[in-house]
Amino acid sequence: MNAPENLPLRDFKNHDLVDDIGKPGVRVERRPARRPDGSVVPGLYNAWIWLDNPGQYNSYTTDMVKGVILAMRAASNDRAVNCVVFTGVGDKAFCTGGNTKEYAEYYAGQPQEYRQYMRLFNDMVSAILACDKPVICRVNGMRIGGGQEIGMACDFSVAQDLARFGQAGPKHGSAPI
C-alpha cells in the first residue's frame, strides 16, 4: 500500500464472523496470483475453496455447508484476495449435491430439522452470490443436483473435458427453485 511517508498505514478492522473458518470437509487456501508469464504478483491472492469428500463425490454435509458459508465470507472480506476458485477434491466430481447418507441417518422423518438444513443450504447459495469477489466454479467430473445449484450461483464455470452436468431431482419428484 502506498501511503505518504508522514502518514502511518491504516489498521483495518477484521470483519470476519469467526476467527476459525475451518470445518470438516472444506479446505481453504490462499494462492499467490500470477501474471501471464507465471511470475507472482506481490500481495495479491486467489482464494481456493475445495469441497473435500471425494469418497462420496464431494456431496456436502451440514458441516460442509457451514464451512462454505464461512469460507466465502472470509474470501469476500480478505482485501488481498482478488477472486475465488470453488472446486472439489479429485477428478470424479465437483459436487453431487447433498449427502444422502446424512439425509437417511438424520434428516429422514424430521421435517423441522430438514427445513433448518434447507435454510442453511439457501444461506450457502446466498454466500456465493454475495461474495464481493468473482467466484469461478472449477468443474472436475460431475456437477449434479445441489452441486449444479451451487455451481450456477458462481459467476462463471470452467470445466474439464469430461465434466458432466445434470439435475437428479426431477427423477425423484423434486426440482430446484
Predicted ranges, named:
Residues 1-89, 112, 126:
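Conserved CoA-thioester-binding segment of acyl-CoA-metabolizing enzymes
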Residues 9, 15-18, 88-124, 143, ...:
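Glycine- (often His-adjacent) and acidic-residue-rich active-site loop
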Residues 46, 107, 162:
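Ligand-binding pocket scaffold of soluble enzyme catalytic domains
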Residues 49, 86, 99, 150-151:
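Hydrophobic/aromatic residues within transmembrane alpha-helices
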Residues 64-68, 117-120, 150:
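Hydrophobic alpha-helical membrane-association signature
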Residues 124, 128-130, 138, 144-177:
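CoA-thioester-processing core
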